Amino acid sequence: MPKKGIHPQWYPEAKVICNGEVVMTVGSTKPELKVDVWSGNHPFFTGSQKIIDSEGRVDKFMRKYGMGGKKAR
């Protein structure tokens, strides 16, 4: 028989709070979860992410290893 009283209390409607606002509910062992970032305000998921690559990785590699001027035959 399983022991009683050894498992934490389960909250099926735990509130996820970001910047003082309830953004979703999930199941958890805590009644409230406070987060700094969630999918609703993360730049990757909102599409506001801007990739700034002033020098391409391939160009940087070619310059670093001296392969910039010669082409393979």
Curated annotation (Swiss-Prot):
One Pfam family of this chain: Ribosomal_L31
Top-level taxon in the UniProt lineage: Bacteria
GO cellular component, one term: ribosome
SUPFAM superfamilies, A to Z: L28p-like
Assembly, per entry: Part of the 50S ribosomal subunit.
Main function: Binds the 23S rRNA.
The name this protein goes by in its record: Large ribosomal subunit protein bL31
Organism phylogeny: Bacteria, Bacillati, Cyanobacteriota, Cyanophyceae, Synechococcales
